[in-house]
């Protein structure tokens, strides 16, 4: 039995043909689709494709997903596995933390962690200099490796989106005087930098798990 897939669009366009950009077996058989797919596969990619609007890094971590989630959902874990965020202290606002990003010459960074235990998602909402608009959002999903790789552990998927504010500081009055850099200056390095940090996370979580230590250390409890 054929389902009425895309019937509403056909009615709206007044034609049974596909809309622009749609590639499905009904209208693009394999001999047509294969060259399209091959064109999408390159040994060398343009710079703006690699460092465009999205930056994603992934890795396998030999650590139970629930224990890794508990660790990542505590904002203070960033003190351990990030390259440059240090000195997390609570603010007067609930769940909002203040730290310093040493990439920006002791720049203040504000962070609120938003998480969902059922979905195993942990999102860090951050901003340099000011706490009122946390526009830098680090999206992390933990996947049970038993489901996707058929082995114990976790798969971590981490994505950042290129918010327009990376290109210019929307709140220049809150910046420290004479600061030579803006966080967006590092966008082209996000992929490598975040992979470095993900390797840090992997090393820390696996060491604790392999050696019988709590993945979330006692100082965070």
Positions of PLM-derived features:
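Hydrophobic ligand-binding cavity/cleft-lining segments
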Residues: 2-93
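C-terminal and inter-domain tail/linker signature
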Residues: 67, 78, 95-97, 104, ...
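Beta-strand/loop substructures that line and gate deep hydrophobic ligand-binding cavities in soluble
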Residues: 6, 127-196, 203
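Short, highly charged C-terminal tails/helix-capping segments
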Residues: 196-221
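Amphipathic alpha-helical segments that line or abut small-molecule/effector binding pockets
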Residues: 66-69, 195, 199
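Glycine-rich portal/gate segments that line the openings of hydrophobic small-molecule binding cavities
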Residues: 79-83, 89-137, 149-151, 156, ...
